[in-house]
A protein has these predicted regions:
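Phospho-regulatory, Ser/Thr- and acidic-rich intrinsically disordered linkers and terminal tails
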Residues: 1-164
Length: 164
């Protein structure tokens, strides 16, 4: 994500965006669709490593919570890992694949030292209209940004808080 480049789609169609992304050396493409009042409503993750782009994951957002005290979040020195709270989560593994990062399972169960590492932690919530919270941690410290996930869908399955 820190190597990501933001491109204003403008009037470009999807194929033009794919060609542009590949020209920049991208292996993944993430599209942000608008929700209510222009806020992010949906994230679509595509794999560009094949001849035809493949949709890997769709995430419907409930919202984004920014830190109380705005500050810049610097690019991590070591690669980011995706981890889950409360056991193995299919969604966390699918998110790791979509972002092209490693999924290490439940926090603390991998035996790997996380000192100096940044994590994208997936916490299950399972409330009506809210399935997961994505948190960014560094050295077990919350960096403040939270992404609230309403539901998700992959090529293989979909999930929402009510089980549908």
């Amino acid at each position: 994500m820190w190597s990501a480049r933001r491109i204003n789609r403008g009037s470009s169609n999807f194929q033009e965006l794919v060609v542009l992304s590949r020209g920049l050396g991208a292996r993944r493409l993430t599209l942000v669709d608008r929700g209510l009042h222009g806020n992010p409503g949906k994230l679509l993750f595509y794999d560009l490593s094949r001849e035809e782009p493949a949709l890997l994951l769709v995430i419907w957002l409930r919202g984004v919570v920014f830190p109380e005290k705005p500050r810049s979040i610097k690019k991590p020195v070591a690669p980011l890992f995706v981890a889950s709270a409360g056991g193995y989560l299919d969604f966390a593994e699918e998110l790791a694949v979509a972002l092209n990062y490693s999924y290490i399972g439940e926090v603390g169960s991998s035996g790997m030292s996380l000192t100096g590492r940044r994590l994208l932690l997936v916490e299950p919530v399972n409330k009506r209209n809210l399935a997961y919270v994505l948190k960014f941690l560094e050295d077990s410290r919350d960096l403040g940004l939270k992404i609230l996930v309403k539901r998700f869908a992959t090529r293989l399955r979909s999930s929402s808080p009510d089980g549908s």
